[in-house]
Amino acid sequence: MRIGFKLVLVAVMTMLILIPLAMVNGLIGERQRYRDAAVADIGRMYASPQTVFGPVLTVPYTESVDLQETGGDGVVRTVRKRQASAWTFFPTRLDASGTVATATRRRGLYRVPVYEWAGTVKADFDVQIPGDVAGADRVIGTPVLGYGVTDVRGLHGAPKLQIDGREVALLEGAGTQDDAGMHAALPVPAPGAHFALISQLQLKLAGTQSIAFVPLGKQNHIALGSKWPHPSFQGLSPWQSEISDTGFAAQWQVASIATDAQRQYLARLPQNTTTGSGPSAARDVTLPTLGVVLDDPIDAYTLADRATKYGVLFVAITFVGFFMFEVIRQLPIHPIQYGLVGLALVIFFLLLVSLSEHVPFPVAYAAASGGCIGLIGFYLSAVLRSALRGAAFGATLGLLYAALYGLLISEDNALVLGSLLLFAILAAVMIATRRLDWYRLGSQVASTRTA
């Protein structure tokens, strides 16, 4: 079999191995979806990822306005109607702080981080109520100080609200259309009155995976601490953070002009509605948030998916090694033997995924790679007609697996490490074949086959 034809055959075998590799990659995606479903199930049973917004001071009012309406006869008439609306005021300063106590919930094979945030939300308001408008017959309603949370099932115990040092009763709902949360009713102010208050809410809020805050104050200070050692900060980066094996502490200092949260909140509120219906600011809009995700630094499915991206490289390198043995040592290797070794390399990724669901990823990687190296080394001892050659090939394969593990755990340096690995492999092939006369070798192989 001529060298050129054998090279084409090796390339075809490599392409065929891509089929089972793609099947393994699809399996990884399927297992990820199962994991996501488990996370959603725990969120439904426990509490969803939480986003906290507020407090927001809402002062409703009604007034008489002149509206232009077209009658059935096509004539435009001016009609005077009562119209409901509201003024919305944000804190001049908002402080949210507390500790995030974490735990792990299990759903089948999957573990999901959950938490309970024991926190305090302090806010200062200093607003001016608009004065009367001549002829409007304006009537100011009961002001509402509202706090929003994504999932009220996460509220543990009874939250306590103090306004100007006095405890105030909390009611269900955030005080605006369908918003989940809590609110307090305040005394009705006079038109043109100066309205100032200091509020402090103490609560315990449970959730899964992440907690975030909407910076609605003119000045916002958010401080979080936890024993979770692997936080992933979302939104704007904290201006100060400390992360160690024992946990993290982070603080954000953000002005409203840096987030545009106030404008986005107002843009989604119902305006000048007489029915009280309209979009929910808490549910229908994605407001800017600051917070933390309780991340898993070693996501087995993500690492396995990245590993399969290198699968074709592994197969190609192994087949190149086979080819070198075949042409240099004059050892005929059948295409079926190429295929069996290629399938063994694919089985490594399948073992990696399945084992990592039960044991830590490093242990799963060591077990899967060790099993495949042992199997391939044992098989090649017969194929290459030497136990030493089989052991040497297995040792080389072990170095490749070690290099792959380094690529997986060092994502930031994956490109440079991968480039160096490819350079080293190419250099090894060039050095090993630097004195080969490929024309003469091809003729020798052809004559040997003929004889």
Give the location of each predicted region.
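Alpha-helical transmembrane signal-anchor/signal-peptide segments
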Residues: 24-49
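Short extracytoplasmic
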Residues: 43-68
